[in-house]
Amino acid sequence: MANTETVLKDAMTSIDGVIGVALVDYTSGMALGTLGGGKELDLNVAAAGNTDVVRAKARTMELLGLKDEIEDILITLGGQYHLIRLLKGRGKSGLFLYLALDKSRANLAMARHQLKRIENDLEV
């Protein structure tokens, strides 16, 4: 099992094309940890904004009567992928991993696979 800092470093080094990664508490909208980003990508702003995305999707599913769980949410921009993976398991409720990827260098299927592995390694 790995702590927040370790899994963020793992994401930055094991996933091709990563621009930044964050562990986010979507009950508060606060990033519990961030790595990467920069002036073009403020990960704390992204954490708060993507919290709204997660809440909106959960609310929509409730209104539709869908009895399922969100695994991940993909937002595709012109030059980037933004991947949000909701975490499951003891101590992980209310958390998501947020990953921003350079579209020209990333392999989306592998990024999703690696995020799932990283989720399993994370101990909160």
Where in this protein do the model-derived segments appear?
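Non-catalytic interaction/Regulatory regions outside core domains
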Residues: 1-124
